[in-house]
Amino acid sequence: MAVKIRLKRMGSKKAPFYRVVVADSRSPRDGRFIEEIGTYNPLTQPAKVELKEDRALDWMLKGAKPSDTVRNLFSKAGLMEKLHNAKNEK
């Protein structure tokens, strides 16, 4: 099973709010997911991102691939650097 970390769209029309979820790559964008690991609100200034960093790092170490947008969010939060350091420690 290929697992992705991606955004699930919530909110109303023209007022998007996203949840960062771990999901099977074959499931629909807003469909079934395995675990919710954070939120992203692009409408606030600056955009508000809340992440469960330990869970996100755990899933990526297990092989989950983040989408491009989620990868950018993780980079800004410093999570990709932590992943790189964790992989090099082994």
Swiss-Prot record:
<dbReference type="InterPro" id="IPR000307">
    <property type="entry name" value="Ribosomal_bS16"/>
</dbReference>
<dbReference type="Pfam" id="PF00886">
    <property type="entry name" value="Ribosomal_S16"/>
</dbReference>
<dbReference type="GO" id="GO:0015935">
    <property type="term" value="C:small ribosomal subunit"/>
</dbReference>
<comment type="similarity">
    <text>Belongs to the bacterial ribosomal protein bS16 family.</text>
</comment>
<dbReference type="GO" id="GO:0003735">
    <property type="term" value="F:structural constituent of ribosome"/>
</dbReference>
<dbReference type="InterPro" id="IPR023803">
    <property type="entry name" value="Ribosomal_bS16_dom_sf"/>
</dbReference>
<keyword id="KW-0687">Ribonucleoprotein</keyword>
<protein>
    <recommendedName>
        <fullName>Small ribosomal subunit protein bS16</fullName>
    </recommendedName>
</protein>
<dbReference type="GO" id="GO:0006412">
    <property type="term" value="P:translation"/>
</dbReference>
<dbReference type="GO" id="GO:0005737">
    <property type="term" value="C:cytoplasm"/>
</dbReference>
<keyword id="KW-0689">Ribosomal protein</keyword>
